[in-house]
């Protein structure tokens, strides 16, 4: 976390900039909320993750930017008060969709591990 926060500071120069985008839900045009039936097998989360990635890739194909974020589902009781989410569904993920502005925060790119450090293919 410290490394990530350090990278944000290097990109933005001001850590407050990053924090400002979250309460306004990243100024997104739309938000997709993904739910799962309560009591669903935990492996269903893998399916939901794959669906999430497919959704974001499809959006990207249409030049629509996306960001999955905890901030979008941080207050599930507020979501339930304002959206028709059944009580027998758990709110699992939120994905903001829209068009990125030229704000400095949108220049931030987190570092990634080298694929050889996380993947081993055995033939």
Which positions does each model-derived feature cover?
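Acidic, surface-exposed loops and disordered segments
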Residues: 1-123
């Amino acid at each position: 976390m410290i490394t990530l926060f350090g990278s944000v500071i290097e990109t933005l120069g001001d850590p407050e900039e990053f924090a400002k985008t979250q309460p306004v839900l990243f100024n997104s045009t739309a938000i997709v909320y993904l739910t799962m039936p309560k009591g669903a097998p935990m492996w269903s989360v893998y399916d939901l993750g794959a669906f999430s990635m497919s959704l974001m890739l499809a959006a990207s194909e249409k030049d629509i930017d996306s960001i999955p974020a905890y901030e979008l589902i941080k207050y599930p009781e507020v979501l339930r008060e304002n959206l028709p989410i059944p009580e027998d569904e758990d709110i699992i993920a939120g994905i903001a969709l829209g068009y990125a502005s030229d704000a400095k925060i949108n220049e931030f790119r987190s570092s990634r591990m080298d694929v050889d450090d996380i993947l081993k293919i055995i033939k």
